[in-house]
Amino acid sequence: MSCCGGNCGCGSSCKCGSGCGGCKMYPDMSYTEQTTSETLVMGVASGKTQFEGAEMGFGAENDGCKCGSNCTCNPCTCK
Protein backbone atom coordinates (compact mmCIF):
# COMPACT_ATOMS: atom_id res chain seq x y z
CA MET A 1 0.00 0.00 0.00
CA SER A 2 1.32 3.41 -0.94
CA CYS A 3 1.54 6.21 1.58
CA CYS A 4 1.77 9.16 -0.80
CA GLY A 5 5.40 9.74 0.09
CA GLY A 6 4.61 9.40 3.79
CA ASN A 7 2.03 12.20 3.74
CA CYS A 8 -1.50 10.91 3.77
CA GLY A 9 -3.87 13.47 5.22
CA CYS A 10 -7.40 12.69 6.34
CA GLY A 11 -8.57 16.28 6.38
CA SER A 12 -11.18 17.93 4.21
CA SER A 13 -12.00 16.01 1.05
CA CYS A 14 -9.51 13.34 2.20
CA LYS A 15 -6.72 14.94 0.20
CA CYS A 16 -3.10 13.96 0.52
CA GLY A 17 -1.14 16.23 2.82
CA SER A 18 0.33 16.23 6.28
CA GLY A 19 -3.02 16.51 8.07
CA CYS A 20 -2.57 13.24 9.96
CA GLY A 21 1.18 13.40 10.45
CA GLY A 22 1.94 10.80 7.81
CA CYS A 23 0.86 7.24 7.35
CA LYS A 24 2.04 5.90 10.74
CA MET A 25 4.34 3.40 9.07
CA TYR A 26 5.99 2.69 12.43
CA PRO A 27 3.11 2.53 14.96
CA ASP A 28 5.41 1.79 17.92
CA MET A 29 7.25 5.08 17.49
CA SER A 30 5.44 8.39 18.02
CA TYR A 31 2.10 6.63 18.15
CA THR A 32 -0.88 8.82 18.96
CA GLU A 33 -4.20 7.20 19.73
CA GLN A 34 -7.24 8.78 18.18
CA THR A 35 -10.74 8.40 19.51
CA THR A 36 -13.78 8.89 17.35
CA SER A 37 -17.42 8.52 18.08
CA GLU A 38 -20.13 7.45 15.71
CA THR A 39 -23.82 8.04 15.87
CA LEU A 40 -26.22 5.60 14.30
CA VAL A 41 -29.50 7.13 13.21
CA MET A 42 -32.31 4.75 12.46
CA GLY A 43 -35.68 5.74 11.16
CA VAL A 44 -38.42 5.10 8.67
CA ALA A 45 -38.19 6.29 5.10
CA SER A 46 -40.11 5.75 1.91
CA GLY A 47 -39.21 2.81 -0.28
CA LYS A 48 -38.15 5.02 -3.19
CA THR A 49 -34.40 5.55 -3.49
CA GLN A 50 -32.77 8.01 -5.85
CA PHE A 51 -29.13 8.18 -6.85
CA GLU A 52 -27.99 11.19 -8.81
CA GLY A 53 -24.44 10.06 -9.54
CA ALA A 54 -22.83 11.66 -6.48
CA GLU A 55 -20.80 8.53 -5.85
CA MET A 56 -19.40 8.56 -9.37
CA GLY A 57 -17.07 11.54 -8.93
CA PHE A 58 -15.57 10.65 -5.55
CA GLY A 59 -12.36 9.03 -6.76
CA ALA A 60 -11.56 11.61 -9.40
CA GLU A 61 -12.44 14.48 -7.11
CA ASN A 62 -9.90 13.33 -4.52
CA ASP A 63 -7.21 12.25 -6.99
CA GLY A 64 -7.65 8.61 -5.94
CA CYS A 65 -6.73 9.23 -2.29
CA LYS A 66 -9.17 7.63 0.13
CA CYS A 67 -8.84 7.43 3.89
CA GLY A 68 -8.71 4.03 5.51
CA SER A 69 -8.33 3.16 9.15
CA ASN A 70 -5.79 5.07 11.28
CA CYS A 71 -5.42 7.84 8.68
CA THR A 72 -3.84 5.70 6.00
CA CYS A 73 -4.65 5.94 2.33
CA ASN A 74 -6.54 2.98 0.94
CA PRO A 75 -5.78 2.99 -1.93
CA CYS A 76 -3.65 6.02 -2.54
CA THR A 77 -2.71 6.91 -6.08
CA CYS A 78 -2.47 10.66 -5.67
CA LYS A 79 0.60 12.44 -6.98
Swiss-Prot record:
One Gene Ontology molecular-function label: metal ion binding
Keywords of this entry: Metal-binding, Metal-thiolate cluster
InterPro entries referenced in this protein's UniProt entry, alphabetically: Metalthion_15p (IPR000347)
Keyword Nucleotide-binding: no
One Pfam family in the UniProt entry: Metallothio_2
Intrachain S-S bonds: none
Chain coiled-coil ranges: none
Function noted in UniProt: Metallothioneins have a high content of cysteine residues that bind various heavy metals.
Family named by the database record: Belongs to the metallothionein superfamily. Type 15 family.
Protein name: Metallothionein-like protein 2
Organism: Cicer arietinum
